[in-house]
Amino acid sequence: MNRSEKAALISQIKAKADTASFVVVTDFKGISVEELTCLRAKLRESGGEYLVVKNTLARIAFTDGIHSIIKDQFKDNCAIAFGYNEPVAIAKTINDFVKTSKFITVRHGSLEGTLLTTKDIEDLAKLPSKPELIAQTLGTLNAVPTNFVSLFANIIRPLFYALQAIEAKKAA
């Protein structure tokens, strides 16, 4: 790879890092091409991307920018997962793949400039996704008026029954 190709690759990695809100550095030693292709497809479905790059090029690309905190993590065999949309979906995809594959391990990550450890990424994967959180919030917001109406119905119902009893007594 000549100098101009390296510069183009560095700028491409830098552009991906600048647009990504979530970046994960993984170790991938010994993984088969089939498994790697499967991981890339799953990450694409989740709104992410998985690249295997040379460490020196990755270090240069990550020298500045929001994810520069992970530039020292590029050692040995490593690859980068970029998350563009929802960090939780990317974390879940990577975490699920790590559980099934013995060849990939998570090293570190960066969520909008904050360094994440392997444990942090596992915890992030346990969180509900954005659509699930929206559904939970809407369910909670919907429960308030429903409970309010039920409360008033429970207050008025005995009064209604008493009035019906008085009306039946007067009619008889």
From Swiss-Prot:
Biological processes annotated in GO: translation
In its UniProt record, a GO molecular function of this protein is: structural constituent of ribosome
Q: Which gene encodes it?
A: rplJ
Q: How does it assemble?
A: Part of the ribosomal stalk of the 50S ribosomal subunit. The N-terminus interacts with L11 and the large rRNA to form the base of the stalk. The C-terminus forms an elongated spine to which L12 dimers bind in a sequential fashion forming a multimeric L10(L12)X complex.
Give the NCBIfam families listed for this entry. Answer: PRK00099.1-1
Role this protein plays: Forms part of the ribosomal stalk, playing a central role in the interaction of the ribosome with GTP-bound translation factors.
> Which organism encodes this protein?
Lawsonia intracellularis (strain PHE/MN1-00)
Q: Which InterPro entries match?
A: Ribosomal_uL10 (IPR001790), Ribosomal_uL10-like_sf (IPR043141), Ribosomal_uL10_bac (IPR022973), Ribosomal_uL10_bac_type (IPR047865), Ribosomal_uL10_CS_bac (IPR002363)
Which cellular component appears as one GO term in the record?
A: large ribosomal subunit
Q: Which UniProt keywords apply?
A: Ribonucleoprotein, Ribosomal protein, RNA-binding, rRNA-binding
Supply the name of the protein: Large ribosomal subunit protein uL10
Task: Cite the PANTHER family for this sequence.
Answer: 39S RIBOSOMAL PROTEIN L10, MITOCHONDRIAL
Query: What does the similarity note say?
Result: Belongs to the universal ribosomal protein uL10 family.
